[in-house]
Amino acid sequence: WPAYPGPNGIRSSVCQTKLGCGKKNLATKGVCKAFCLGRKRFWQKCGKNGSSGKGSKICNAVLAHAVEKAGKGLIKVTDMAVAAIIKYAGKK
């Protein structure tokens, strides 16, 4: 189970800063914001040890790792997608 980022670490604004949302291109901002909000909800629900008492289905180590990894991959993928869209749009 990855380390709980802490009450400050799960904040959407902190997450966005860490991921550098919208720095390279503004299109990543929306995707990034949505991801950071989802991540915040995940950690709020799952807490430090990964369960909200009821053993929620979404609170598992695999998902927690995926959530933390996704942030890093997400921006890269969005940047690539935006670049591809711009390239494609320019061809018409």
Curated annotation (Swiss-Prot):
Subcellular location: Secreted
Major subcellular site: secreted
Record-level GO BP terms: killing of cells of another organism
Tissues expressing the protein: Localized within the skin and proboscis and are most readily isolated from body mucus secretions.
GO molecular function, one term: toxin activity
GO cellular component: extracellular region
Disulfide bonds, paired cysteine numbers: 15-36, 21-32, 46-59
Keywords, comma-separated and alphabetical: Cytolysis, Disulfide bond, Hemolysis, Secreted, Toxin
Superkingdom to which the source organism belongs: Eukaryota
Record family assignment: Belongs to the worm cytolysin family.
Primary role: Cytolysin that shows hemolytic activity (on bovine erythrocytes, HC(50)=5.75 mg/ml). This hemolytic activity is completely inhibited by small unilamelar vesicles composed of PC/PG, PC/PI and PC/PS in 1:1 molar ratios (with at least 100 mg/ml concentration).
Protein name stated in the entry: Parbolysin P7
Organism, as annotated: Parborlasia corrugatus (Antarctic nemertean worm)
